[in-house]
Amino acid sequence: MYNIEALQNRKHRKLLLSAGISWMFDAMDVGLISFIIAALKVEWELSSEQVGLFTSINSIGMVFGAAFAGTLADRYGRKAVLLWTLLLFSAASGLSALAASFAVLCLLRFFAGVGLGGELPVASTLVSESVPAKERGRVVVLLESFWAGGWIASALIAYFVMPRYGWQSGFLIGALPALYAIYLRTSIQDPPRFKERRTERNEPLLRKFKSVWTAEYRRSTIMLWILWFTVVFSYYGMFLWLPTVMVMKGFSLVKSFQYVLIMTLAQLPGYFTAAYFIERFGRKFVLVSYLLLTALFAVWFGSAASAGSLIAAGIGLSFFNLGAWGGMYAYTPELYPTKFRSTGTGLAASFGRVGGVIAPFLVGWLIARDVSIPAVFILFFASIVVGALAVWLLGTETKGRELAD
């Protein structure tokens, strides 16, 4: 479909693969949560509010992780923060398998969320700063495509491993990235443009936070914060509840895992088409079009009743939603200069994670009060449309532009 010159460079290929695999592990952990909570709801007899609280706890940790890891990465380096966040979420995930109570499990998932929330924006900034401008968006979307690999892995683990060895096996597998961090320590380096600005690393943290709200960057910051909030709100509200919603629609737990696996496979072509279009038609085109199509498929999924209709709607939902995520991760670092790029990206992601906190808990609260599934998904339709409008009206096109220093 397209030829990417940057990936003909061995160094760039190694960077994309190294950061991508860490990204895949993150996605696997998030995906496993959606399957584990469906099993725990039955085994521990959790209420809908507890299910919502559990999935929200992870996002609360991600709020803190994204906010502070981005700023720390601007001071201490992208590589160092990437490694520490990877180790943190791996350790917390492994220990989650030993949790004997709901409260302990929630506490451990909070720390896992801190690591997850910190790793993602730092990894996208690292890759964005390391490849040529003409292919930067495409390469970052391909980085995001590893997320689909992680979700596919989580669905396979849920379908083949967890029914035999229990939900604890999912968390134990989630501890494997700790071993991968040893490899990352020698396989990646901070981007040259970051190393060249050593004198600006010790700038006070508060000044970095304020920098994203100066007159030059305020419009972009407002747009990004709206975009991130609406996308994360809708994603975590819909996808973390997918297996549970399938069960509520009358399918068995194992059958729901099978259907979600099929839907998850659609994420890969979603990323690949977004990677093609993002350098051909621009960031705004990809984000607006993919978000609006996500909104339409959300309405269809919420109202679908038959297995065929649910799977078809779920495939469209996965295809366009994850393609939009790829565009968002490519677009965000491009709107800030090197000295506070990771801070700006992290703060936008952190604000978005607030949506990830609210949505799963809100879904549980609404369902407990007999609000219908179609009505819940109309809420996500509205959220996604707001995000698309923010990009269309406030966004600045960055296709082909060099990153600001």
Q: Where are the model-predicted features located?
A:
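Helix-loop-helix hairpin linking two adjacent transmembrane segments in secondary transporters
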Residues: 143-186
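Helix-loop junctions at membrane interfaces in 12-TM secondary transporters
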Residues: 97-108, 163-165, 303-313
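Extracytoplasmic gate region of multi-pass secondary transporters
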Residues: 33-34, 216-271
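Extracellular/periplasmic helix-loop-helix junction of adjacent transmembrane segments
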Residues: 34-64
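Cytoplasmic helix-loop-helix junction between adjacent transmembrane helices
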Residues: 108-145
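Helix-breaking motifs and short loop linkers at transmembrane-helix boundaries and internal kinks
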Residues: 45, 77, 98-104, 132, ...
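Cytosolic juxtamembrane N-terminal segment immediately preceding the first transmembrane helix
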Residues: 1-28, 42
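Conserved MFS/SLC helix-loop-helix module at the cytosolic interface between two early adjacent transmembrane helices
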Residues: 64-102
